[in-house]
């Protein structure tokens, strides 16, 4: 309790935390809680199970409580907000529209960023929507930079999306992440001219007066948008000239200085340093905190944590609500009408309630995006930007909206791009760093080679039901086509799963399948083995977890697995994202994930709390044809087995290539075992019991100590002798001095 109290956590929350046996904060909690309590935006990355949910839930609960308490007692903060209206009255770079490490001089024209690892950008205070315009940029050093034009919808990282057009010092033009050769390189003492002809949809550049020719043709759908001066720097310094001073290389052909643009063609930036202030009157359906999760299970897990942390928070009590799809909305609407302070939910249902006016964002103080990389990969970028735009940036008591983003990795381009748009000078708390495999996890690869292991030819119809990709192909034994080997791989993988379970006498494991259909087929195969959902305690008892299962069934299945009522949880990556299941000794990858980061996420399910874990990956030696639905139904009722490039919904999946990418990512070679799946003893750990704590000393370590023991004893004797000699020498010196 004292450890959390020292970080400023209120006693009521600290008491609840203590009852959860959290004696000390985890690393992510120790770093993030003070930052959030201090009012800052925070980007945090840590492994699942590291206490990440507590890192944002605890401060959110406390600040929401303090806000409600102040309202209850009639206290009001200062709602005055500094505006940038005076800044917008002249052409200069905008201090309210820049990266966190981007500095602007007092004149508004000299710009600098000394960040050497990341790009930081900025836009001007004003833009233009009609006419032909020109400005100059002088390079003051040899750093990297891109200059050009962009709309307010663009990322500050100029040229990495479809709303910006840039020209870089390496002699590349950039638009929508496409970097092409253009003009020539430029560096210190060079002057770059930036031309914009909106009427003819042209962007071009010059170097020291030399016209470099057409760079971009502006798409027709952008013709009526306002374009702003833009740049992005990496350890560089530039100075802009919008025409208030004489140009070094005056433009020709009717181009005029931006500062001379007619008022009717000038558009002021919306990024003014001020913001919409939330209304003072409280609404029952207007929560103070909105926490968005990528899945129902993760939303339920987070809500349970919130309930635990707020257990002793009273006067006023906090009211929380879970908003997820797949369940009746009537009860959720009733709770909303009665009043709610913290909302936890998934994007679909939250979006529905916002669009119908049932959920108000007018008083949101906290916006939390948990597993942000998962939200973005599921296509919720527009949803996030849309709701962010509806939330007042300043609360009625004068506090700024706080945005907290949690992600498996902060090195994702999309996460960085999102943070630039919706966060205010965020602090990065990255305790995950580069992906690595914990010492408590043994991970091995089992090659699945149908050309060597002919077992599949003898199984007749007793094998696992396959996904139907080859139902129209001739895959009978004796053939030598890619389709034959692909179908054989699917059959062998089912047999290898059963073999692995029996070989290691697995009592609990998570089995990752690539698709929902694969999960269903694996569950059915376990039923064939005598197991399944209804066979509690059976060697092949199992439950399924994926988005096609109804929410009550998913919740029930997850609880049964956590309580060890069944041995195996068969699931997809999306369904299992972020769910914290402790003490699982085994993970089996039926198919390698197509994103290398997901491999680390999967095998990270084992080896937690210092318990040993084994991750087994089945890797096909040949390419496997698999479903890859691009149809509108997303696979429901789809039997189009043609390849994607031929208008179908299948691809050839190359697991050997994926394995090499994973090994390169982890900078290690993953051990391979034979198809009998016997894992040899580890040289250091010796015999390991997976699911148990790692032995403090094991394997060869004890013998190593015995070998070193005589040497250590000799060193101790020498140390004693040296110290005795030193003391004796000091005594003799004193006696000698006295004799004189």
From Swiss-Prot:
Annotated function: Acts as an ATP-dependent RNA helicase, able to unwind both RNA-RNA and RNA-DNA duplexes. Possesses 5' single-stranded RNA overhang nuclease activity. Acts as a positive regulator of transcription. May be involved in 3'-end cleavage and polyadenylation of pre-mRNAs. Binds DNA and RNA. Component of the tRNA-splicing ligase complex required to facilitate the enzymatic turnover of catalytic subunit rtcb. Binds (via helicase ATP-binding domain) on both short and long poly(I:C) dsRNA.
Source organism: Xenopus laevis (African clawed frog)
Disulphide-bridged cysteine pairs: none
Keyword Lyase: no
Gene3D superfamilies attached to this UniProt entry: 2.60.120.920, P-loop containing nucleotide triphosphate hydrolases
Keywords noted in UniProt: Activator, ATP-binding, Cytoplasm, DNA-binding, Exonuclease, Helicase, Hydrolase, Mitochondrion, mRNA processing, Nuclease, Nucleotide-binding, Nucleus, RNA-binding, Transcription, Transcription regulation, tRNA processing
Name this protein carries in UniProt: ATP-dependent RNA helicase DDX1
Enzyme Commission no: 3.6.4.13
SMART domains, A to Z: DEXDc, HELICc, SPRY
Alphabetized GO MF terms: ATP binding; ATP hydrolysis activity; chromatin binding; DNA binding; DNA/RNA helicase activity; exonuclease activity; mRNA binding; nuclease activity
Ranges spanned by the short sequence motif DEAD box, renumbered to the chain: 370-373
One GO CC term on file: nucleolus
Name of the coding gene: ddx1
Domain Helicase C-terminal: start-end pairs: 493-681
GO term, biological process aspect, one: double-strand break repair
Free-text note regarding domains: The helicase domain is involved in the stimulation of RELA transcriptional activity.
Lineage: superkingdom: Eukaryota
Residues reported in the UniProt entry to bind ATP: 46-53
